[in-house]
A protein has these predicted regions:
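Short inter-helical turns and helix N-cap capping residues of alpha-solenoid HEAT/ARM repeat scaffolds
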Residues: 36-38, 68-71, 99-102, 132-133, ...
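Long, low-complexity regulatory segments enriched in Ser/Thr/Pro/Gly and acidic residues
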Residues: 246-255, 266
Length: 404
């Protein structure tokens, strides 16, 4: 039985990619431009056309790209397919493109401008390449790489200047890929730029030399962190940390027990703009004593049972929320569906209602109750991803963290 496009792509998520790549290019182009077809089939056809677009179909495919009423997924796929067509450039550069609110279209337009050699897009591409979302960042980087390949990285950097952090971040990346040393960028005042620079560094001896004369405390800490990443030398890192005076971010109200639990859970893996003092503290300080989560839950259950609160079996926060994961377990109790939360990061417990009976029972069993006053302390300069945000969080959210 002869294959058809419909049989090769019968429904969303079920596409014979290799079969479409071997299919007649003219038929694929016709399907990709056919608004009567499902968008996912049209996109699959566009993707299967890579490197073999029939010239006679190009005007119709371009018309689909330029149709703001068409499905953005299809437009983006077609734009990627035809990103080498210079006749698209005037449309791509038109100010109206900035008003196109279709999801992903603005990024795709910028990427195409980079692919077509539009040096005036360098600034917007640098902004995109500085975005915390990986797919946007990669689009920006690909566009900048295309410009650098065409004009040389010096021309791209000259177009950008260095006033904005995103321009300097692009400079770090392009200079590194051109074989230049970017150790000097560890002293950049923007932590995201300095963080990117340390990721690129691979010469431990050069870092040791830089560390001795780094111009700022943060530059020294970035150098120390990069050196630790390269050598995994915990003892040496701790020795240098002591020599620097054990610098750390002071947070009013954050005691040592809370601090240790938080820094050792989040410090090394925090977001780019996190103060490097948190990262180094996570490496150089002792973690909280090891504990058995199962034993802790058993102790909580026993305390709640002894208090006559009729606790139900504990579940993970992911199970309680029916998705995701995090740093606490949930114990339901009583007839009204009340819940108490037991952190996996230490002996911390809390609930939404500050139930005095629950608090009394758990405190008598050695737990530490996190009330509103303590829970609301914001841990400054420690960026942790949380439902799209990367800003510092409060103690309650960090100890009882859940992400879907």
């Amino acid at each position: 039985m002869a294959k058809t496009i419909k049989k090769l792509s019968p429904e969303a998520g079920r596409t014979d990619t290799e079969g479409l790549r071997a299919f007649d290019a003219d038929a694929l182009a016709k399907c990709a431009a056919d608004a009567a077809q499902p968008w996912w089939r049209r996109r699959a056809c566009a993707q299967a056309l890579a490197g073999r677009v029939p010239e006679r179909r190009v005007p119709r495919l371009i018309a689909c790209i330029q149709d703001a009423g068409d499905v953005s997924e299809v437009r983006i796929a077609l734009l990627g397919l035809l990103a080498d067509r210079p006749e698209l450039l005037p449309w791509l550069r038109h100010e109206d493109r900035q008003q196109d609110g279709a999801y992903g279209m603005a990024e795709a337009v910028l990427g195409a401008r980079g692919a077509l050699g539009d040096l005036t897009a360098a600034g917007a591409l640098a902004t995109l390449a500085f975005n915390p979302w990986r797919h946007r960042r990669e689009t920006g980087e690909e566009g900048l790489d295309a410009l650098a390949a065409r004009y040389g990285f010096e021309a791209v950097l000259a177009e950008l200047g260095g006033a904005r952090p995103e321009d300097r971040s692009t400079g770090v990346r392009l200079r590194h890929h051109a074989g230049e040393d970017v150790t000097d960028a560890l002293a950049d005042p923007d932590r995201a730029v300095a963080h990117r620079a340390q990721e690129f560094l691979t010469d431990a001896e050069r870092l040791r030399g830089y560390l001795a004369g780094a111009p700022t405390e943060e530059a020294k800490l970035w150098a120390l962190y990069a050196l630790y990443r390269l050598t995994d030398d915990t003892a040496g890192t701790r020795r240098r940390y002591e020599e620097l005076g054990r610098p750390r971010v002071e947070v009013a109200g954050l005691d040592e027990e809370l601090r240790a639990a938080i820094v050792h859970e989040y410090g090394q893996w925090a977001e780019e703009r996190t103060d490097p003092r948190w990262r180094i503290e996570a490496v150089c300080t002792q973690p909280p004593p090891a504990c058995d989560p199962a034993e802790r839950l058993q102790r909580a259950m026993a305390a709640l049972t002894a208090a006559g609160l009729a606790p139900r079996p504990p579940v993970s926060c992911g199970e309680d929320n029916r998705q995701g994961d995090g740093t606490y377990h949930v114990i339901g109790y009583g007839p009204s569906g009340s819940k108490v939360f037991i952190s996996t990061l230490g002996r911390f417990a809390t609930d939404h209602d500050d139930d005095p009976d629950v608090r009394r029972a758990l405190e008598s069993a050695g737990f530490r109750w996190i009330d509103q006053a303590v829970g609301s302390i914001r841990v400054t300069d420690l960026g942790v991803y949380y439902f799209g945000s990367r800003d510092p969080l409060d103690v309650h959210t960090l100890l009882f963290y859940w992400q879907d």
